[in-house]
Curated annotation (Swiss-Prot):
Gene name of this polypeptide: rnd
Name of the protein this chain belongs to: Ribonuclease D
Record flagged with keyword Glycoprotein: no
Function, as annotated: Exonuclease involved in the 3' processing of various precursor tRNAs. Initiates hydrolysis at the 3'-terminus of an RNA molecule and releases 5'-mononucleotides.
Subcellular location(s) per record: Cytoplasm
InterPro entries (UniProt xref): 3'-5'_exonuclease_dom (IPR002562), HRDC-like_sf (IPR010997), HRDC_dom (IPR002121), HRDC_dom_sf (IPR044876), RNase_D (IPR006292), RNase_D-like (IPR051086), RNaseH-like_sf (IPR012337), RNaseH_sf (IPR036397)
GO BP term (any one): tRNA 3'-end processing
Reactions catalysed: Exonucleolytic cleavage that removes extra residues from the 3'-terminus of tRNA to produce 5'-mononucleotides
Source organism, top-level taxon: Bacteria
PROSITE patterns in the record: HRDC
Ranges where the 3'-5' exonuclease domain occurs: 5-168
Stated family: Belongs to the RNase D family.
Primary localization class, coarse: cytoplasm
Length: 363
């Protein structure tokens, strides 16, 4: 039976008594009406015990903080990115060192992007249910079925950790995992908004450079507003409205309001702020990369790079897309230098194969 922890001192006492070398971690949170996730439950495995920790209790997150940052305790988590953001918001810290079982499974050749249930079945043979996936985790008390579902989310992490550690050790890939886990942590730790968000929108490639800069202004403003007001980005300004305003900039505020009339979700109450954002140049916008459709030549180079990466992945027993995504390769073509996002171990296993192809395309 899992232990329901409602006093910070109880959490501290249990962890001090156990002094574990590893803890299994998961969270339940809600993010339907906010920009930032709201922590609703923390599940923690310690040895044979499972603690279900109520973060709504005053002082609980402060008690958690000490153990999340203990460098002598490995934090075993599955697909941790959203949980990391949640811990950062609630506790102000990130759990380190991190062993992400989803990343580890991919690096070990077990499978790419594996869900927790599938990985549990693969390693332990246990079939988990999905009964409480859409549950209300903020309500109290939690139901017995919620408690059992939550406990299952960490119950099998150590068995998976042991098996994947064994495989990665045999394959000499534990260093790969450490690098990827630290990159994930750094991404969350230093997230202050995407610098060039317009490049990620498919519609941007059809806009003229001046329109792309206007789109960049709107998206940067939207992200700042979403963070400050703790509301989803789409509630501030959705992509369709932003793209239309960038493509067809209104001549004045009245014209802006007329354009808003065409879109039910347009933020009429924020019209003045939208107008200012649209018409206020950013200090760095002249340096912004432009989204553009690939040329025939670049398409051919991209195809050769993708084929080479796929072959290398097959040789290493890695799932497709793990070594380098399409976007990584597009960045490589644009920059003509190794993308920082691909890191060191990928460079070691890929650079000798892909860089000659890139150099040949320039000849």
């Amino acid at each position: 039976m899992p232990h329901w922890i409602t006093h910070p001192s109880e959490l501290t006492d249990r962890l001090q008594a156990a002094r574990p070398a590893r803890i299994g971690l998961d969270t339940e949170f809600i993010r339907e009406r906010t920009y930032w996730p709201q922590l609703a439950l923390v599940q923690m495995a310690i040895g044979e015990e499972i603690l279900l920790i109520d973060p709504l209790i005053p002082g609980m997150n402060a008690a958690l903080k000490e153990w999340l940052t203990a460098t002598d305790i490995v934090k075993v988590m599955h697909s941790a990115s959203e949980d990391l953001v949640t811990f950062k918001c609630a506790c102000g810290v990130l759990p380190r060192p991190l062993f992400d079982t989803q990343i580890a499974a991919a690096l070990a050749g077990v499978g790419g992007g594996m869900g927790y249930q599938k990985l549990v079945q693969e390693v332990t043979g246990t079939l988990l249910t999905k009964g409480e996936t859409r549950s209300d985790w903020m309500r109290r008390p939690l139901s017995p079925s919620q408690l059992e579902y939550a406990a299952d989310d960490v119950r099998y992490l150590f068995a998976i950790h042991d098996e994947l550690t064994r495989r990665l050790t045999e394959q000499n890939r534990l260093g790969w995992l450490a690098e990827d886990a630290e990159r994930l942590l750094a991404t969350v730790e230093h997230d202050d908004g995407e610098r060039w968000p317009h490049v990620s929108l498919r519609t941007a490639q059809f806009l003229e450079p001046a329109a792309q800069r206007r789109l960049l202004r709107l998206l940067r403003w939207r992200d700042l507003q979403a963070r400050q007001s703790d509301r989803p980005r789409s509630w501030i300004l959705d992509n369709e409205v932003a793209s239309q305003l960038a493509r067809f900039p209104p001549a004045d505020l009245d014209a802006l309001l007329q354009q808003f009339d065409k879109f039910p979700k347009a933020p009429r109450k924020l019209a003045n702020a939208v107008w200012d954002a649209l018409n206020t140049p950013l200090p760095d916008e002249e340096h912004a990369p432009l989204a553009q459709a690939a040329t025939d030549g670049n398409k051919a180079v991209l195809k050769r790079l993708q084929d080479t990466v796929a072959q290398r992945s097959h040789e290493l027993g890695l799932p497709d897309g793990l070594l380098a995504s399409r976007r990584h390769l597009e960045t490589l073509i644009e920059q003509r230098s190794w993308p920082a996002a691909l890191g060191q171990w990928r460079r070691a296993v890929l650079e000798a194969q892909v860089m000659p192809l890139l150099e040949a395309s320039e000849a």
